[in-house]
Amino acid sequence: MKKYVFKRIMVSLATLLVILLVLFILMDLMPGSPFNDEKLTEAQKALLYAKYGLDQPIVVRFLLYVKNMLTGDLGVSYAINKNFPISSMISERLGISILVGIMAMIIGTIFGLILGIVSALNHNSWIDNLCSAISVIGVSIPSYVCALLLCYFIAYKLKLFPILYNQKTPFSSLVLPAVALSVSPTANIARFTRSELIDVLNSDYILLIQSKGVKNYKMILKHALRNALIPVITVMGPILVNLMTGSSVIEKIFGIPGIGSLMISGIQQNDYNVTIACSFVYSAMFIAMMLIVDILYGVIDPRIRVSKESK
């Protein structure tokens, strides 16, 4: 087990290093400059490039960035908040992005499990077809479309919740963004729960339990549902990270000061350091969660660990 965990950690670190290198190359190829909007002469721009080390070869900048990153230094902002440490900017905004993601995950998990269980227990009925149709629609509709519909009908027409984020009422301001983000995970969890629960209900040991005269609700709650939810739980980690990493447009729509909106501002203003740092933080969160899921899979099912170690 220790060998398996060590190998997964090394692979994750190598993946992060490759991602960081790709981000550097992409930022280097991007047109424009963080100093384009300023009324500066070419000589002044050259001085700024030299000040921030942007005149150095990409390899030198990459190695210096990695060295500084190991000490927690992600550089400073060039355009959004000049000379302000990016690590501080991210730490101020990361919490609200995580909160929105967790709220969306809670909503998606509750309604996804309900839809999936109801669908599986009424397999091949009109209820199953209705739940499946709702799941397909949920997967198909982008979160930003849901956000715009919620803004118009719930916030503008019914005036139940504010459209834009308000620090005085943070919780109510995050309800609509969380609901918009929860549509896709609701559908995915519902489909996954339905599939797993149907497989479990058709398994031999469930048929054996039924033959012993165990009541249906006890059989479902104590045996079928418990076994069906093990694979579902393992996919919730990546779904949560996807919610946080995919909330950039939602944060812009609702004016939420999260890391997603910060990354979009960095792209719009050619703030290389901000864009790289935000993208890297998202990547690190996703890979860390996938690492945890891999380890959990290895603990839950040793066959997975053995097969990966053999490779």
Report the location of each language-model feature:
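Membrane-water interface segments at the C-terminal ends of transmembrane alpha-helices
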Residues: 23-29, 65-67, 133-162, 180-185
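N-terminal signal-anchor/signal peptide hydrophobic helix marking the start
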Residues: 6-15
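An internal, D/E-rich "acidic patch" concept
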Residues: 55-113
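Hydrophobic alpha-helical segments of integral membrane proteins
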Residues: 9, 44, 48, 58-74, ...
